[in-house]
């Protein structure tokens, strides 16, 4: 059955949003909602938050506070452009956006939408979790509350967001210049991640890694920090032995399951391969057995 066409409201003043959201549903890029509506989901009234994007920059940097503020209602393309145009440095998030879906989807999808769907496979969330993000939420009375991202994520399709609330921005401590993101999916574009990894660290003059933070998606009910593996790497040179120990420690941080996209066994093997590649990028001198990320043909084994 085709859902009834919704009434669309598009405020341009943040002060109007809370009033309009009474009995309505917030929408930004709508990339997830469109899929839900094809499955019959009703949404009689939608409040389009993208009208708020013109009132502020996509990314702002507060050097005094050492903090980046990222809009939750701008398209991902605008966020990536803001990060590469000098508004801030966030290599892991920039890389995640570059690998997110397709150009068309990136021109519509938003950080806010990617957060509130509560998907453990969401591609922007590992970078934000690794960076220690805080979520700014507007309450129905127009007030503001802030929640750590780790506490915002409650489970598959569940987040700490009450009726009438909406996400306005995400704030992160200024990330280091060294960071990245890798994902494994069924193809290079328009693919949900079988699993993904974001990382960031400082590299000291002697080569030791400090401030190591890792986060992985699709290996637990929510995106999770790899705290045990990060502790192994902290203040260490990423030698072969240290990397082997960090890779072995991943099992303590993840709890993947078998599902339609991949088996738990496949995900554990890919998790090890992704972290190894982040720490020791493949080179022409690598041993033949050093990189063991399995092929997608093995995903159901």
Where are these regions (language model features)?
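C-terminal structural segment of proteins
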Residues: 1-301
């Amino acid at each position: 059955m085709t859902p009834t066409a919704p009434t669309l409201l598009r405020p341009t003043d943040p002060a109007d949003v809370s009033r309009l959201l009474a009995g309505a549903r917030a929408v930004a890029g709508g990339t997830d909602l469109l899929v839900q509506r094809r499955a019959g989901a009703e949404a009689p009234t939608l409040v389009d938050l993208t009208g708020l994007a013109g009132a502020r920059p996509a990314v702002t940097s507060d050097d005094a506070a050492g903090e980046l503020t990222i809009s939750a209602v701008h398209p991902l393309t605008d966020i990536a452009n803001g990060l590469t145009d000098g508004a801030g440095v966030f290599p892991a998030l920039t890389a995640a956006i570059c690998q997110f879906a397709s150009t068309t989807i990136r021109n519509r999808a938003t950080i806010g939408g990617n957060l509130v769907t509560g998907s453990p496979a969401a591609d922007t969330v590992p970078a934000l979790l690794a960076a220690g993000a805080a979520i700014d939420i507007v309450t129905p009375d127009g007030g503001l509350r802030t929640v750590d991202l780790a506490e915002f994520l409650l489970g598959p399709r569940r987040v700490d967001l009450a009726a009438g609330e909406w996400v306005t921005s995400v704030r992160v401590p200024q990330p280091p210049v060294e960071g990245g993101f890798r994902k494994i999916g069924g193809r290079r574009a328009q693919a949900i991640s079988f699993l993904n990894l974001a990382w960031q660290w400082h590299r000291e003059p002697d080569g030791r890694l400090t401030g190591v933070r890792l986060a992985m998606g699709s290996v637990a009910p929510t995106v999770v920090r790899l705290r045990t593996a990060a502790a192994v790497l902290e203040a260490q040179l990423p030698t072969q032995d240290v990397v082997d120990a960090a890779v072995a420690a991943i099992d303590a941080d993840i709890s993947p399951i078998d599902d339609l996209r991949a088996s738990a066994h496949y995900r554990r093997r890919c998790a090890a391969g992704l972290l190894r590649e982040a720490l020791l990028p493949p080179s022409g001198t690598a041993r033949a057995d050093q990189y063991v990320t399995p092929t997608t043909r093995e995903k159901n084994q």
